[in-house]
A protein has these predicted regions:
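Surface-exposed loop/linker segments characteristic of extracytoplasmic
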Residues: 1-197
Length: 197
């Protein structure tokens, strides 16, 4: 991976990091997933050099608040230009999510490797979705989809496990969390300085 080059090659050549982001990294994938190792290549996506991205089952915690216009959420741990250190995690590193399972994402696509929990107002489309069972415009805690066609998961936590989602906390421990965990508890676990202990 060459961090001084863009992830996608120019339209006319196959250079830069295209081959690298198509590499499947087995430890990035949950064995219980129900999808292939990499995004299928179709003529439309290949024309834009997007086919074949390798999937990832785990996503960094960006937090809960809606992002500012054109920006990303920044009350979590991992986000673009994040500089959150242990001293910034005032809710306690044993109570704060560092990263967790997602239904799918692409490790070579920066934002796809991140997740955000819905906000209380549910005023931002990425926050809400379909939980795989019932169409809803209410915040869903886990397993949310962008559309009822069940085709694409959009920037949230979830898993192919029946009842739980695995999370790594900032103290290095791992917890399996029930998919029915109260939304307010999950929201508190996704912020690094929300005064919830």
């Amino acid at each position: 991976m060459n961090f001084t080059e863009p992830k996608n090659p120019p339209q006319t050549s196959h250079v830069n990091n295209q081959e690298a982001i198509q590499q499947v990294i087995p430890t990035y994938l949950c064995p219980s997933r129900s999808y292939p190792n990499a995004r299928p290549i179709d003529p439309a996506s290949q024309a834009r050099n997007l086919g074949g991205y390798a999937y990832i089952s785990y996503r960094g915690n960006t937090g809960t608040s809606p992002p500012p216009a054109g920006g990303l959420t920044t009350n979590g741990i991992l986000y673009r230009d994040s500089s959150v250190s242990f001293r910034d995690i005032r809710d306690g590193d044993t109570n704060t999510i560092c990263f967790g399972e997602g239904m799918f994402g692409y490790w070579g696509d920066g934002n796809s490797g991140l997740a955000r929990l819905a906000d209380d107002n549910n005023d931002n489309q990425p926050d809400w979705g379909w939980d795989g069972q019932n169409p809803s415009t209410s915040p869903q805690t886990m397993d949310t989809y962008l559309n009822p066609a069940n085709q694409q998961h959009f920037f949230g936590y979830g898993s192919w496990h029946r009842d739980s989602v695995n999370f790594a906390l900032c103290d290095g421990s791992v917890k399996s969390v029930s998919k029915t965990t109260d939304f307010r508890v999950m929201k508190a676990m996704c912020t690094h300085d929300g005064s919830e202990r």
